[in-house]
């Protein structure tokens, strides 16, 4: 087993044990009712910013600054993000329709790095319907998909579009980025601006590859579980 294959195998296992399968149809339906397509989401965030506001319940100069940075990052990533051959091959195998619903906010730094990649992946297969909803407007759903007790975002939910059952989830960031922040916090005791800069550099160097690998692993697990349920 190569190092690359071993890494992907570990990701698949971790997602298999982490994925919940309990129903939350009401919360999902409410979120979908006020969700946006990718371009519409970006327009809402931009218009809010131009009006001197940010999405979410909390307004601050810091969040305005982060929103402005995110706009520039997402504009760049929308143009430069490329899917690997492995990702395209895996996505082509999805012959059933899926809903990808992401809970996020316009000022979320990880969201700016993750959303363009997810959008490219969804564009690669018409069976994937990609939607985004604001976290703070959908607290009921967010409370059902916490990460270690926190409302971490972005949070991707893979949903069956016919019955609105949650099939899997991912987020808020790829494991390499998780490890970077965890190690920095262990050494320095806090997550400061240096840590945030290091995180953005990690994303830049990775070029969305690890995000793709983890989402492919997630969808593989979703597909495998669906096939097992048919047996």
Label each PLM-derived region with a short phrase.
Residues 4:
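Cationic, low-complexity basic patches in intrinsically disordered or flexible, solvent-exposed regions
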Residues 154-169:
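A short, hydrophobic beta-strand/beta-hairpin element that forms part of a small beta-sheet core
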Residues 105-111:
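Mid-length scaffold segments of soluble, non-membrane domains
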Residues 130, 142-158:
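Positively charged, polar, low-complexity stretches
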Residues 11, 17-98, 143-149, 166-231:
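Non-globular targeting/processing and membrane-anchoring segments
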Residues 101-105, 127-141:
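Thiol-based oxidoreductase modules, predominantly thioredoxin-like and allied folds used
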Residues 112-122:
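Typically the conserved alpha-helix immediately C-terminal to a functionally engaged Cys/Sec
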């Amino acid at each position: 087993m190569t190092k690359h294959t071993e890494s992907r195998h570990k990701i698949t296992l971790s997602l298999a044990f982490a994925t919940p399968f309990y129903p939350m149809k009401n919360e999902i339906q409410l979120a979908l009712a006020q969700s946006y397509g990718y371009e519409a989401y970006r327009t809402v965030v931009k218009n809010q910013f131009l009006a001197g506001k940010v999405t979410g319940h909390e307004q601050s100069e810091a969040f305005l600054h982060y929103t402005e940075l995110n706009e520039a990052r997402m504009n760049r990533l929308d143009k430069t993000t490329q899917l690997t051959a492995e990702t395209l091959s895996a996505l082509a195998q999805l012959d059933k329709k899926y809903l990808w619903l992401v809970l996020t906010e316009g000022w979320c730094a990880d969201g700016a790095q993750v959303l363009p990649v997810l959008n490219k992946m969804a564009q690669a297969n018409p069976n994937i319907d990609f939607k985004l909803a604001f976290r703070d407007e959908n607290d009921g759903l967010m409370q059902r998909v916490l990460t270690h007790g926190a409302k971490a975002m972005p949070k991707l939910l893979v949903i069956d579009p016919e019955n609105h059952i949650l099939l899997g989830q991912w987020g808020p960031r790829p494991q390499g980025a998780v490890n970077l922040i965890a190690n920095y916090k262990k050494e320095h005791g806090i997550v400061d601006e240096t840590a945030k800069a290091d995180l953005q550099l990690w994303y830049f160097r990775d070029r969305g590859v690890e995000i793709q690998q983890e989402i492919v692993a997630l969808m593989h697990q979703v597909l495998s579980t669906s096939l097992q349920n048919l047996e």
